[in-house]
């Protein structure tokens, strides 16, 4: 026991000496920055104007596809909040699949598929790339925009707005954006209960028909795939 106590004492003493030698008035030197290696992108443009970028990376047997719309920010005005619904509406079902069928097929192959007002993204194992592309294309080209889905999203949004109505942080954020950008700027406007109620199914369809066009978009393909396969 005595040897054990002495050993602990020497350890603490040594540690104390080490700590005493550290100059805590100076920040420790940073380590070397991690090296990020990104493969060189191969690019080409389709006849419809869609720009395609392919980056081959065989580290994992996975492939991801991301379609991005290159559009300027838009002022939603008395329909503020419209763009927050677009992605969910596109994922709400297609001419070929209901929402549940779409979700089941995605889950069955362990893939991911999502959409927003400015993008559609999908990823899967390489062996399922054909299937996930089929599902992505179905969402992109054949959305049916069910009205029941829009009503559900509007109710959820109204509930969310009600919970943040008296939240100091949410109020501060809205005021800050309005002061910085102005209420009539895309970054300064805020979604309200009234603007949410103003949104109609025709607004959703009009947005989709206006902005989801190949000549203002690019498709990034990254993973275990090359230009020939793409």
Tell me the role of every PLM-derived stretch.
Residues 10-11:
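Short, linear, compositionally biased motifs with a strong N-terminal bias
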Residues 4-7, 17-54, 226-230:
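Proteolytic maturation boundary segments
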Residues 22-24, 29, 103-207, 225-228:
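Acidic/histidine-enriched segments that form metal/cofactor-coordinating
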Residues 40-42, 46-50, 61-67, 81, ...:
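Envelope-exposed proteins and targeting segments
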